[in-house]
Amino acid sequence: MNILVINCGSSSLKYQLIDSNSEEVLAKGLCERIGAKGSVLTHKTAEGKKAVVEEPMPNHTEAVHLVIAALTDAEYGCVRSLDEIGAVGHRIVHGGEKFSKAAIITEETIKAIEACSDLAPLHNPANLIGIEACKEVMKDIPMVAVFDTAFHQTMPEKAYMYGLPYEYYEKYKIRRYGFHGTSHQFVSEHAAEMLGKDIKDLKIIVCHLGNGASVTAVQNGVSVDTSMGLTPLEGLLMGTRCGDIDPAVVEFICKKEHKTVEETLNVMNKQSGMLGLTGISSDARDVEAAVLEGNERAILTVNTFAYRVAKYIGAYTAAMNGVDAICFTAGLGENHRLLRQRVASYLGYLEAELDDVRNDVAGEDAIISTDTSKVALLVVPTNEELAIARETKKLVGE
């Protein structure tokens, strides 16, 4: 069965068509600038055929029409017709407390996702637009919602509650939810396979280090704590997000800079993190280049980033009373040897030993610890699209 995986943003739509039996990516692409001038679809097949389609996309429905046209195109498509797509899997950012696993999309599911929009105003409305667009174009094809937050619904109360008046939780469901759950689950399960062990016997810490970054403690196969909170702003320093901060800083900046709360949160979400500290870029490649040139703020930034990751590893080792494996994944975790080296330099107390030769790897499965290391260190490339396809297949079946 071929499964179309959709990740819909407010002005973009990423897609992959995956053969759920072979798990091969048949085609993938991206629609950009939806609803604006200069909208474009970039499409690529497994055979290396490429297409760039510059067509007006006034809305996401038109974008989905163009995606289907690309997938079925005689020259650069990979299927003959819509009939060869068995199901659609949608990435949904926030499922709140309503969803602890993936769900078949029904009117009831859509209403529940809408009800979570207050918790993810930047993401859920866009995800819903993607669902409605696909329903309009692919009326009879079953669809599944896979939630970033679902994997973390196993966190105990002591891990997810904030020290705020309890009625705020009762009234507004203000608590820690966590994100990147699909990635953390995929990576932890694959790490257990790489180690040849049952995940139910392991304590694993997954470091998802990309432009967005989070750390998760996975004990016996379930998430017991994670670094992101009510929103993805909590936790690690990130590409443009500040991460953990004294909440009183918000009021302080508002007063000093004469900004509204919304404007200050925008700074913390979009102008902080690596971008804010370096003043150069949110892209780690640019930051590393600046480090090599001796840029002091870039050096401060990479050291701060690694330090924060190492602190969370220490916290989650305590939370689980030990750790068997530490995994590095996502853009930075998979591809930046020096970052892994910096983080590992803090792990001597765990008797975790990095093998410098094995660590010279990028974007592929690897055990990068020494044979004598008391804790396994791994590089495990994430594959959220494949994880979504697997969840979709589970619910839809053949």
Region locations from a protein language model:
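Short beta-strand-loop/turn "lid" adjacent to the catalytic site in phosphate-handling enzymes
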Residues: 71-123, 144, 150-159
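Short glycine-rich, Thr/Ser-proximal phosphate-binding strand/loop in the N-terminal lobe
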Residues: 12-57, 229
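Catalytic phosphate/nucleotide-handling subdomain of diverse soluble enzymes
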Residues: 218-219, 224-260, 266, 330-361
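Glycine-rich phosphate-binding loop of actin/hexokinase-like ATP-binding domains
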Residues: 151-255
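Internal helix-turn-beta structural module
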Residues: 299, 303-324, 333-398
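Extreme N-terminal starter segment of soluble prokaryotic enzymes
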Residues: 1-4
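Glycine-rich beta-strand-to-loop/alpha-helix junction loops that act as flexible
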Residues: 9, 91-93, 209, 323, ...
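Adenine-nucleotide phosphate-binding core of ATP-dependent small-molecule kinases
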Residues: 266, 273-277, 284-319
